Structures are given as C-alpha cells and as structure tokens.
Amino acid sequence: MYSTTDFRKGLKIEIDGVPYDIIDFQHFKPGKGGAMVRTKLRNILNGRVIDNTFRSGEKVERPNLESRDMQFLYHEGSELIFMDLTNYEQLHMSEDVTNGKSEFLKDGQQCRVLLYNEKPIDIDIPLTLILEVIETETAIKGDTVSNVTKPAKLETGVVIQVPIFINIGERIKVDTRTKEYIGRE
C-alpha cells in the first residue's frame, strides 16, 4: 500500500479496482481541518483524466501491474499475438488496447507489454523507428515548393506524410507518437 506521502508524478495507484497514473499532485492545508492532497489521475485502462482529493496520510492500493519483454509474432484479425520471451507462452491482445501503437509493429519486433492482473493493457514501442517506404507517388521534376509532402505507405502498413524526394525502398526515421517523418536513415 502507498500513503499520500509517497505520491509523486508517474506513481501507479489503484482506486476501487481501477489502476491510475498520477499526472500531478499538490499538498495543501485548508483553513480548518487536516492537510489534503489534490491529485490529477489518468485511468490506465481507458486514458480518462480525473481529479481526486485525498486526506493526508490516507492509504491507497498498489496495482498489480507488470511489464514484460515480449516479441510481436503476427496479426490475427483485430488481435495481436505476442510471445513472452521468458517462458515462450503466447499472449493475445486486442488492437483497440494499443491506442494506435500497433500500426508500427513488425513481425518479430520486440517490445514491452504492460499487464494488469495478467491481462495486457498497453504496449511500449520505441519513440522512433526506422521503416521502409513500400508505396508512394514519384516526385515530378520542378515540384519544389517549400515543404511539399506526399502520402507514403510504410512496411507496417501505416501511411504518413513524407517530403516529395522520398522514394519507394528508402528507409526513413518516424516518430511513433505523432506519426511524423523525422529524416532519412
């Protein structure tokens, strides 16, 4: 169990059976009564942000969260299949849970899977990835107005905007949070 004195940004707590991530907290003492702690919490399961106030010294549960190294094997419909690298068990996860991160998964790629009570709830992928362009339009000579972009399909199937000088077969660096082109590899 955690006490409100243990609170810090990024700490994971559980309230009424739901895991939360502390985004912000502030200790304050009202005119009368004991000290309190105001918090801003993000629900780990659905991403919603709530405000909650705790009495100073109040105890909260520690969630049963675990992060495991896994290898992405393949897509099966809207399911993602991972293999645990320690015991080689397969784990099925819904694409909906990943908040769009599954668009950047390649077969055989390693990542960390966050589990809550042995159920997968999120994946951690690198902030940037090197991916190959498999489909894009060819640039027309003289098309050099500043910052001209075109859509490009990458090897994982995600489509992003790239500069016009990028061609099929080139490897590019992509920001996985914003789905933006960073540069050539």
Curated annotation (Swiss-Prot):
Name any one GO molecular function.
translation elongation factor activity
The species this protein belongs to is Lawsonia intracellularis (strain PHE/MN1-00)
Q: Does the keyword Cytoplasm apply?
A: yes
Q: Which InterPro entries match?
A: Elong-fact-P_C, NA-bd_OB-fold, Rib_uL2_dom2, Transl_elong_fac_P/YeiP, Transl_elong_KOW-like, Transl_elong_P/YeiP_cen, Transl_elong_P/YeiP_CS, Transl_elongation_fac_P
**Where is it chiefly localized?**
cytoplasm
> What biological process terms from GO does the record include?
peptide biosynthetic process
- Gene3D superfamilies in the record, alphabetically? 2.30.30.30, Nucleic acid-binding proteins
Its function? Involved in peptide bond synthesis. Stimulates efficient translation and peptide-bond synthesis on native or reconstituted 70S ribosomes in vitro. Probably functions indirectly by altering the affinity of the ribosome for aminoacyl-tRNA, thus increasing their reactivity as acceptors for peptidyl transferase.
Q: Which UniProt keywords apply?
A: Cytoplasm, Elongation factor, Protein biosynthesis
Please give the name of this protein: Elongation factor P
Which gene is annotated as encoding this protein in its UniProt record? efp
At the top level, the lineage of the source is Bacteria
Pfam family membership, one: EFP_N
Cellular component, GO, one term: cytoplasm
